[in-house]
């Protein structure tokens, strides 16, 4: 058995095909081109742009990606049918991912054919695709449950007929790492890819095991998107190879987080907060012991530097926070409390945490201002707010605010009243800089139709990030309150930074 990786390892990204099969996800041709361009910039080798046989829109997407001049190979999914192959070639694809069911379950139940019929279909399709001038990756669907001698026969003859690459598809996530180590080596008739699903949580580990066993390419999706529990995650695999095995993947790792958030925004599938590498909590620390350790030496509680994947470390404060973490956070905010003031601030933060409150940056500032008796004049004050929305009306918001003493009125439309309100606020402060809404969440604190809602937002400006919240019975006003609190924090920090620079 091969025990070292066969380098360089290639990455075949199927976010635009298998990832788009995530329930509820549907990308436009323009959105697909955006993601494909970002993938190519990050350094993936092959982009599966979709299935040319699926729709006119899919063919438009494939054509646009093929014509974009990207460094990555443009591939399309095809069945073992001449019509599928013609559509792929006519759309301008460089290669085809020729998928053929190889388990008896799929052959008999899905296709209602015999092994002999399926294998001949596969080989004939390989020959036809080569006649059309395409690179061919012959893929065994449900290979984990296939008779391995039959799979080897399909692959061996497929290569004889012209297949350039092979792919072992663990279609429902049943392949284990130890089994992958045993069954991959006998299938290396040509460069072999591994395609894993994460139904039982083994996708990443099995992909690594297959690569160690001689596979040279991994099929992945951004954020682990895919049917059911998803596919092996690009960002997790890249960093596992780099950090744990010292492999130079050739991927621009500092772009992994921007790519992840880009895909999350376009697909509408939010990132799990505790997702490795790209989740909100991946580089966030609250516990006093952990936070203190990280502040002294980040490697005490982090496996890699967050900057390596385009992230920043966050120390958040709550009931588990110790004095050192609170003092460091206050220092970053421009506060220098005395020992007695620090103790009081820590006690108040812990009381809020014990009450079940999520503590935002704006909360901490308010506590510090109160304890240290600092008079704070907000940079932004709301004077008037109007929202128009209805079944036949485009949601429109207008807002009048005092921004650093100047009265400014702004208006905007949105997909809904909350969206319109936030856009109006952003437009009103445009003269003092672009404030971006990175995250928005809402919870009902009480029950009933008059429920008190708690809106939390994360805003950023010029590389700085802040969290804030608002609580009202009116979700729109709670959102406005949260955004204004965050904007005030950002503008206040900016003012203090400039004051320090002038000193």
From Swiss-Prot:
<dbReference type="InterPro" id="IPR024890">
    <property type="entry name" value="Citramalate_synthase_CimA"/>
</dbReference>
<dbReference type="InterPro" id="IPR013785">
    <property type="entry name" value="Aldolase_TIM"/>
</dbReference>
<keyword id="KW-0100">Branched-chain amino acid biosynthesis</keyword>
<dbReference type="InterPro" id="IPR054691">
    <property type="entry name" value="LeuA/HCS_post-cat"/>
</dbReference>
<dbReference type="InterPro" id="IPR000891">
    <property type="entry name" value="PYR_CT"/>
</dbReference>
<dbReference type="GO" id="GO:0009098">
    <property type="term" value="P:L-leucine biosynthetic process"/>
</dbReference>
<dbReference type="Pfam" id="PF22617">
    <property type="entry name" value="HCS_D2"/>
</dbReference>
<feature type="domain" description="Pyruvate carboxyltransferase">
    <location>
        <begin position="9"/>
        <end position="257"/>
    </location>
</feature>
<protein>
    <recommendedName>
        <fullName>Putative (R)-citramalate synthase CimA</fullName>
        <ecNumber>2.3.3.21</ecNumber>
    </recommendedName>
</protein>
<dbReference type="Pfam" id="PF00682">
    <property type="entry name" value="HMGL-like"/>
</dbReference>
<dbReference type="GO" id="GO:0003852">
    <property type="term" value="F:2-isopropylmalate synthase activity"/>
</dbReference>
<comment type="subunit">
    <text>Homodimer.</text>
</comment>
<dbReference type="InterPro" id="IPR036230">
    <property type="entry name" value="LeuA_allosteric_dom_sf"/>
</dbReference>
<dbReference type="Pfam" id="PF08502">
    <property type="entry name" value="LeuA_dimer"/>
</dbReference>
<comment type="function">
    <text>Catalyzes the condensation of pyruvate and acetyl-coenzyme A to form (R)-citramalate.</text>
</comment>
<dbReference type="InterPro" id="IPR013709">
    <property type="entry name" value="2-isopropylmalate_synth_dimer"/>
</dbReference>
<dbReference type="GO" id="GO:0009097">
    <property type="term" value="P:isoleucine biosynthetic process"/>
</dbReference>
<keyword id="KW-0028">Amino-acid biosynthesis</keyword>
<keyword id="KW-0808">Transferase</keyword>
<comment type="similarity">
    <text>Belongs to the alpha-IPM synthase/homocitrate synthase family.</text>
</comment>
<comment type="pathway">
    <text>Amino-acid biosynthesis; L-isoleucine biosynthesis; 2-oxobutanoate from pyruvate: step 1/3.</text>
</comment>
<dbReference type="InterPro" id="IPR002034">
    <property type="entry name" value="AIPM/Hcit_synth_CS"/>
</dbReference>
<dbReference type="InterPro" id="IPR011830">
    <property type="entry name" value="LEU1_arch"/>
</dbReference>
<keyword id="KW-0412">Isoleucine biosynthesis</keyword>
<dbReference type="GO" id="GO:0043714">
    <property type="term" value="F:(R)-citramalate synthase activity"/>
</dbReference>
